[in-house]
Amino acid sequence: MFDQKQCEPNPEKLDYTGKVLVLSPNTLKEEYWSPESQLWLAESGFGCSPTARGRSILCTCLGDGEQTRWNRNDFIGVLKDEYLPDWAKEALKQYQRPEQTEKQEMQMGGM
């Protein structure tokens, strides 16, 4: 399971749009406590912005492709790139828009 140690610092100041978020285990039922259920791609919603009044974030689960709405405070934060598992990298290629994929590859050193 992922925790705060694998996340970027100061999540309250970060824009979540297009980022891989770590869902808090406290939000999940115990039977879903797994990395596959914890990693979500933030796509849109007022909750992506750290300064917006709205808290909703529309997301896709990297483990199974489920799309749903979570609140910003349901997440621990943004996963650091070095902790992104290979299975999640593959899922990102499938769910990200092309411009998001290019931007992420540039940030990760052109993987």
Predicted feature locations:
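A subset of signal/propeptide-processing and intrinsically disordered low-complexity segments
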Residues: 10-13, 76, 100
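Non-Sec secretion/translocation targeting segments of pathogen effectors
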Residues: 98-111
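Acidic, low-complexity, intrinsically disordered interaction modules
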Residues: 25-85
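Mixed-charge, Lys/Arg-rich low-complexity intrinsically disordered regions
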Residues: 1-29
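Long, compositionally biased low-complexity segments enriched in polar/charged residues
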Residues: 7, 23, 78-82, 88, ...
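Charge-dense, intrinsically disordered terminal/linker segments
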Residues: 59, 94, 102-104
